[in-house]
From Swiss-Prot:
Enzyme Commission code(s) on record: 2.5.1.15
Molecular function GO labels: dihydropteroate synthase activity; metal ion binding
Name of the protein in its database record: Dihydropteroate synthase
Coiled-coil segments: none
This protein's GO CC annotations: cytosol
Its job: Catalyzes the condensation of para-aminobenzoate (pABA) with 6-hydroxymethyl-7,8-dihydropterin diphosphate (DHPt-PP) to form 7,8-dihydropteroate (H2Pte), the immediate precursor of folate derivatives.
UniProt keywords, alphabetically: Folate biosynthesis, Magnesium, Metal-binding, Transferase
Length: 267
């Protein structure tokens, strides 16, 4: 059965929009990681730089100090480790320790050396669509062009196609109407035949789906609805805060999709 991967978010930051400060010591971060493993997480994504609107710029040294000690301990656990960074130096330090995936919110545009680093360690990379929000093309066309250009650079650096993930970047450099367009046309990203990761968890897009004022933690059920929708569209992974809920939903949808596939196959 095709299994949708659940990537659990572990922010080791003081200022992330959903859980800033909650896991910003090594002990707290490891305790949360163990909880996620018990809940059935496939990959834990460690981030030391907040992406919330208005976040403070973090120096390379500070990002290293936040992330590396956590990764050093996480690699002792039985789980795949991803690091959410756009800096090749952080990527290299963490891959050297045993991380096997880099989640780059700038898709190699900020630091092109990241492709060579990921290739050297035969690791996976997530390329997220981002930008300044200014575009001359419609959003989906611009997203596809941008991501495929960066994916090609990743392949040229020696990263295997199956190790290159595409993320449509919900919550980044898009208007609300553009985000709705991207969600409706996720299957066009899936059609590129690169594995696709969807990361909507607790974001403003989810808040607007609900249609009323909510805290980030109150957006988990609506986030899970996008998990189901994404799986039906063909995505292969979701990046979420609430691992338990999304594991259960993804397993159930995977089962139902497989059942439908088998019935078609038999007939």
């Amino acid at each position: 059965m095709t299994k949708t991967k659940i990537i659990g978010i572990l922010n080791v930051t003081p200022d992330s929009f959903s859980d800033g400060g909650k896991y910003n010591s090594v002990d707290k971060a490891i305790a949360r990681a163990k909880e996620m493993i018990d809940e059935g997480v496939d990959i834990i994504d460690v981030g030391g730089v907040s992406t919330r609107p208005g976040h403070t710029e973090v120096s390379l040294e500070e990002e290293m100090e936040r992330v590396v000690p956590v990764v050093e301990q996480l690699v002792k656990l039985d789980v795949q480790i991803s690091v959410d960074t756009y800096r090749s130096e952080v990527a290299e330090a963490c891959l050297k320790l045993g991380a096997t995936m880099i989640n780059d919110q700038w898709a190699g545009l900020y630091d092109p050396k990241i492709f060579d680093v990921v290739s050297d360690y035969n690791a996976e990379i997530v390329l997220m669509h981002n930008g300044d929000g200014q575009r001359e093309q419609p959003v989906v066309e611009e997203m596809l062009l941008s991501l495929l250009t960066q994916a090609n650079k990743a392949e040229m650096a020696g990263i295997e196609k199956g190790n290159i993930w595409l993320d449509p970047g919900i919550g980044f450099a898009k208007s609300r109407s553009e985000e709705k367009e991207v969600m409706a046309r996720l299957d066009e990203l899936v059609a590129t035949e690169y594995p696709v990761l969807l990361a909507t968890s607790r974001k403003r897009f989810i808040k607007e789906m609900i249609g009323k004022e909510t805290t980030p933690a109150e957006r988990d059920e609506a986030t899970a609805a996008t998990t189901v929708y994404g799986i039906m569209k063909g995505i292969q992974a979701v990046r979420v805060h609430n691992v338990d809920l999304n594991v259960k939903l993804a397993q159930s949808i995977d089962f139902l999709k497989e059942n439908e596939h088998e019935r078609h196959h038999l007939s």
